[in-house]
Amino acid sequence: MIKQRTLKRIVQATGVGLHTGKKVTLTLRPAPANTGVIYRRTDLNPPVDFPADAKSVRDTMLCTCLVNEHDVRISTVEHLNAALAGLGIDNIVIEVNAPEIPIMDGSAAPFVYLLLDAGIDELNCAKKFVRIKETVRVEDGDKWAEFRPYNGFTLDFTIDFNHPAIDSSSQRYAMNFSADAFMRQISRARTFGFMRDIEYLQSRGLCLGGSFDCAIVVDDYRVLNEDGLRFEDEFVRHKMLDAIGDLFMCGHNIIGAFTAYKSGHALNNKLLQAVLAKQEAWEFVTFQDDAELPLAFKAPSTVLA
């Protein structure tokens, strides 16, 4: 059978919090079968757990948060969540001694390296996928996102940014998902923001960790980072990275075709909640062997080495 995945060992890293600008220690721990993805704040006494759940997601101007019933939150979970989706990690406990996951370089790549460093272990329990059975679409003005039935996982994302640094040929990105494709084509794409927004937020004591080290920064005319872009279409690739993380907030890889136009964290989450709320639109599935498993989810050699 296709088995659930966790880590082989505990790994730790440090980074800077996007909101506070302070050092954050991140610890990733293996977890037993059927634990799911759990974020944990150890700066609180007692520590507070936040299971990944579409209904717990809140989108703020700066990041995605998980919020519990007491309005306690953990922030900046989206890029790590994308790395978990990319590598198909089903069970993990993610600890931080702060209210937020460190921003690292603004992409998912540092988290991918950390997960690969921990090693990936298979548990003797069937991995559950969410399979889309009916088309579900959500809209917000001219923005929209939808899932259609498809035996695999494809993503097709279009942005519409009128900016000199983003030419029209760099506004759409489509891919057949796999762990290899995620690592090579998506994981290194960084988040982006306007210099004026960062300066304004910092003047109000917010976004204190925001810098050229953790984002693509633009003014009205150009990219300000000395090293420029990692991909010509890094902006839309990062929006796809965000979507992969947002859609994994249900804790399961999804079998279906995702298409979006000008979507963001909030609309991605609205789509995920709309799918899960419509019982006839999806089902849980497991697979007995590799032959049945959609190509998108076959483990690459680098992961289960």
From Swiss-Prot:
Family from the record: Belongs to the LpxC family.
Protein name listed in UniProt: UDP-3-O-acyl-N-acetylglucosamine deacetylase
The organism's taxonomic lineage, starting at the top: Bacteria, Pseudomonadati, Pseudomonadota, Gammaproteobacteria, Enterobacterales
Signal peptide: none
An example Gene Ontology CC term for this record: membrane
Entries under Gene3D superfamilies matching the protein: lpxc deacetylase, domain 1 (3.30.230.20), lpxc deacetylase, domain 2 (3.30.1700.10)
Keyword Hydrolase set for record: yes
Binding site for Zn(2+): H79, H238, D242
